[in-house]
Design a protein with these regions (language model features):
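Short helix/strand-capping connector loops at secondary-structure junctions
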Residues: 275-284
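A general structural signal marking secondary-structure boundaries and capping sites
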Residues: 18, 75, 128-135, 172, ...
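Short Pro/Gly-enriched beta-strand edge/turn motifs at strand-loop
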Residues: 15-22, 63-65, 198-200
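ATP-binding pocket architecture of kinase catalytic cores
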Residues: 26-158
Length: 305
């Protein structure tokens, strides 16, 4: 593939101008933007996420870069280093300032090995042991291409209701994908969150990946795990575990190793896992359509609503 000349020149300049872009190859898996593996004339390699069509929301690359930089401060956790980011801020005309991109360290991919799963547990435990004073984040960010509000609050059930579930429910209702009677069922659940999510309040804010599923686990060439595409904030650690279990999950060795080192409080499997997964199911309803509606309502029904 060949990058547009303006984009290639801007990247070469951002990297110091001493080397030229020799090759670019598409990398699969990009839902928000185009992705490519870059090779420079001095053999350095990088991962590029870019948007030429203006399809990605303004600020999305900046938000991801901030999450990756925060993950990079966690000892024992591997994530790609941020090399450069060029983005429009929210409210700016997307594309008005030229190409937008996120340039990252290239992490050579490999295959999972027996040590991958306990190592992933150790990495996630290190992340979750990075605690905050409140639930939320320094700025709003995104889940997929959808806005994610992170205004800080001290009460976890309120955060999950007002910053996560209610905005996605409102969007689904406005789009006609959830009807009024189904909305009432959600509202009855919301009234119970103070009691049902008390464990999150008790354990306090942990630094989260925020979108932890198998597609955002990158196994390195030696089998070590790295985390990519974060949507970070401070929340209840169980949110990451619940999301990881929503679409197949990781190897059971990962969960056993995590639970051995930091057991979950009672009520996770029966209640809190479903409440946390509801957020991601509503996100899928809003991103991909009513095909996820049935599973979303089934999860709500499993909670008694």
């Amino acid at each position: 593939m060949r990058l547009p000349a303006e984009l290639a020149a801007a990247i070469e300049e951002a990297l110091g101008g001493a080397a030229q872009l020799r090759a670019a190859a598409p990398v699969g898996g990009g839902c928000v933007a185009d992705t490519a593996r870059l090779v420079l004339s001095d053999e350095r390699r990088f991962f590029l996420k870019y948007d030429l069509a203006g399809a990605a929301p303004a600020g999305i690359f900046t938000a991801e870069a901030e999450s990756l930089r925060r993950l990079a401060t966690v000892s024992g956790l591997r994530a790609p280093a941020v090399i450069d980011v060029r983005d429009a801020e929210s409210g700016d005309a997307v594309g008005a300032g030229g190409p937008r991109w996120l340039l990252l360290e290239w992490l050579e991919p490999g295959r999972a090995a027996p040590h991958t799963w306990p190592a992933l547990a150790t990495s996630l435990l290190a992340l979750h042991r990075s605690s905050g004073s409140e639930f939320g984040w320094d700025r709003d960010n995104f889940i997929g291409t959808l806005p994610q509000s992170n205004e800080r609050v001290g009460d976890w059930p309120s955060f999950w209701r007002e910053r996560r579930l209610r905005p996605q429910l409102r969007a689904a209702v406005d789009a006609g994908r959830i009807d009024g009677s189904e909305q009432d069922r959600f509202e009855r659940l919301f009234d119970s969150l103070g009691e049902r999510l008390e464990a999150g309040q008790r354990e306090g804010p942990s630094l989260l990946h925020g979108d932890l599923w198998s597609g955002n686990l990158h196994v390195l060439s030696g089998g070590d795990p790295a985390l990519i595409d974060p949507s970070s904030y401070y929340g209840h650690r169980e949110v990451d575990l619940a999301m990881s279990q929503l679409f197949g999950g990781f190897d059971y060795v990962f969960y056993a190793a995590y639970h051995e080192q930091w057991p979950l409080l009672p009520g996770y499997e029966s209640t809190r896992r479903h409440i946390y997964q509801l957020y991601y199911l509503l996100v899928h309803v809003n991103l991909f359509g009513a095909g996820y509606r049935g599973r979303t309502l089934a999860a709500l029904g499993s909670l008694g609503y």
